[in-house]
Amino acid sequence: MKKLVIILIALLSFGAIADAQVSVTKKTKIERLISLRGGYVSMSRHNDLIYLSVWSDNRFDEAYIINLGRDKATAMQSLEALIEIADTIKKDESIDFNDGLHEYYVYRGLLKGEIWIKANDRAGYGITSKGELKKILDHLTFEVY
């Protein structure tokens, strides 16, 4: 219940700033917003593609966007692949990716279970863990318009 209240407060306080961030993706509708240590993650859809968007704790930084695919099943596979890849990375190492829109990398932190997904070409970043990525997967099971 406490987590739900925190998420709701984050959603309400993020509203006006989220509108400004949305302009980065040309009026992308934000479907889910999850507060993470050091950042915020949202699921969104634009031009028939599903994206994972991440902002740093400084919510005035630009969001960066990871293209997850055209449908829910593909998006879930993309996130599962990120989790599996992160599991193979040694601590304090990273793997670079390019989704056709942006370059980003998945980095294994020094803390147990810590995974960073960070863009190479944008200011924003997200800090998450395997468990929190699974929460994003769970949220994605809701309909994304």
Regions found by a protein language model. Name each.
Residues 18-145:
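Positively charged, low-complexity terminal tracts
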Residues 4-14:
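Sec-dependent N-terminal signal peptides
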